[in-house]
């Protein structure tokens, strides 16, 4: 299993860099159905069991695509136009992983772009809506689809923000952590405080590590702070080409 996990990590490492560069460029719909019913419906997944006969599974979380131009703070599950952008963003990432993994990518009520201009307290209710959708989808996937297979987790931007929350909540349990190949939290800051508060989180130190987080960010020369890396903040990363 360890050799299989390591091989999957090597396959995706180089591809991540190029796709990451490409990607860098108050009405809420409620889910009324229980999660088993809601995410058992294929239409609530952008990709469900995409690909066959692969070495692992991939649970992929979409980045922010809803600009909130309608005044909404979470994406509506009925917004077909934004769902097209949602799938388009996933298509920019899927090529990194699809040769190695069967892909699962749920639609979720992601936070819209204006939410990132809010304070942490103001953001919290919209973040909770987005995260609970992702967590519900993950629970459905794991209980009904995983069947003991190695698991890759991946996200970018908001997708990585939610993925980090998922890792904190679930992956202290060997039921989940023993399946983890790696978690690709690209384009979101992971700090020493995160690791200190959740010691089961492990950052990758080399190409053969498994069960670890792989994370990095890029900033233009001269940039001293950003949404991802606020002033005075140090984030953890690994060079994906090492």
Predicted regions and their residues:
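Active-site catalytic motif of lipid deacylating hydrolases and related acyltransferases
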Residues: 61-149
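C-terminal motif of bacterial Sec signal peptides marking the signal peptidase cleavage site
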Residues: 23-26
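Sec-dependent N-terminal signal peptides
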Residues: 9-19
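Surface cap/lid and interfacial helix-loop subdomains adjacent to catalytic sites
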Residues: 133-147, 169-242
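Gly/Ala-rich beta-loop-alpha elbow adjacent to hydrolase catalytic centers
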Residues: 155-159, 163
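N-terminal extension/subdomain marker
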Residues: 30-85
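N-terminal secretory signal peptides that target proteins for export/translocation
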Residues: 1-8
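Loop/turn elements at helix/coil->beta-strand transitions in domains of secreted/extracellular proteins
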Residues: 54-56, 99-103, 147-150, 177-181
């Amino acid at each position: 299993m360890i050799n299989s996990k390591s091989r999957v990590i090597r396959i995706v490492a180089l591809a991540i860099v190029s796709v990451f560069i490409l990607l860098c460029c108050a009405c809420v719909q409620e889910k009324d159905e229980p999660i088993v019913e809601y995410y058992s419906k294929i239409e609530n997944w952008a990709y469900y069991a995409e690909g066959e006969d692969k070495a692992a599974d991939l649970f992929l979380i979409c980045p922010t695509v809803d600009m909130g131009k309608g005044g909404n703070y979470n994406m509506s599950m009925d917004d077909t136009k934004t769902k097209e952008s949602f799938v388009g963003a996933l298509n920019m990432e899927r090529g990194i992983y699809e040769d190695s993994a069967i892909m699962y990518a749920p639609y979720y009520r992601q936070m819209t772009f204006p939410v990132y201009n809010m304070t942490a307290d103001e953001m919290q209710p919209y973040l909770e809506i987005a995260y609970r959708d992702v967590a519900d989808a993950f629970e459905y996937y794991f209980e009904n689809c995983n069947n003991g297979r190695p698991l890759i987790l991946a996200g970018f931007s908001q997708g990585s923000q939610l993925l980090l929350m998922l890792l904190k909540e679930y992956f202290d349990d060997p039921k989940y952590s023993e399946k983890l190949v790696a978690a690709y939290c690209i384009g979101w800051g992971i700090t020493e405080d995160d690791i200190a508060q959740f010691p089961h989180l492990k950052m990758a130190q080399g190409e053969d590590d498994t069960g670890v987080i792989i994370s990095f960010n890029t900033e233009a020369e001269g940039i001293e702070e950003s949404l991802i890396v606020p002033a005075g903040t140090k984030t953890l990363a690994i060079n994906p080409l090492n």
